[in-house]
Curated annotation (Swiss-Prot):
It comes from Klebsiella pneumoniae subsp. pneumoniae (strain ATCC 700721 / MGH 78578). Keywords: Cytoplasm, Methyltransferase, rRNA processing, S-adenosyl-L-methionine, Transferase. It comes from the Bacteria. Belongs to the class I-like SAM-binding methyltransferase superfamily. RNA methyltransferase RlmE family. It is an enzyme of class 2 (transferase). GO terms for molecular function: rRNA (uridine-2'-O-)-methyltransferase activity. The lineage of its organism: Bacteria, Pseudomonadati, Pseudomonadota, Gammaproteobacteria, Enterobacterales. Its EC number is 2.1.1.166. The gene is rlmE. S-adenosyl-L-methionine binds at G63, W65, D83, D99, D124. This is Ribosomal RNA large subunit methyltransferase E.
Amino acid sequence: MTGKKRSASSSRWLQEHFSDKYVQQAQKKGLRSRAWFKLDEIQQSDKIFKPGMTVVDLGAAPGGWSQYAVTQIGNSGRIIACDLLPMDPIVGVDFLQGDFRDELVLKALLERVGDSKVQVVMSDMAPNMCGTPAVDIPRAMYLVELALEMSRDVLAPGGSFVVKVFQGEGFDEYLREIRSLFTKVKVRKPDSSRARSREVYIVATGRKP
């Protein structure tokens, strides 16, 4: 952006971002991102984490969710995280950098999980947004379908699935699909999620055998 003026929309986004109380709190607390607060709100309402759990974190960078989950599962727990972008190390987190859509990366991720099942699969994945819902929503739905497929492969009976979804075409069908696989499903809009954002979080607990 050197030598060019920022667009009005990007300037508005930056102003909103840095004046956001959750961004400011995250900076004060030394947290990786404001996403920490979203997962904290979900944990307070749905109690998905317990000490000793194994957790898969998809779309993990910069590490807000992994950073929070570590505090809940303790030293006896384990987190296997994956993202296309790099992520600074977090004690207790086994991080794999790569594109989750790539078969080799997926295979490496499954190898890290191993034969034992996990108790939580969580996904904060989102595509690069262009601002056109007709393009953005299908891209986002593709990622959440992949996350659900991962949960089918690795989640233990009784386990939980937490996924960020953008409301739009395909959302209702996706929600029905999740309801067929879990005993309890809630749609959450945390206070720390920006009001104008289409994002919501589906919290599914009690994976059916």
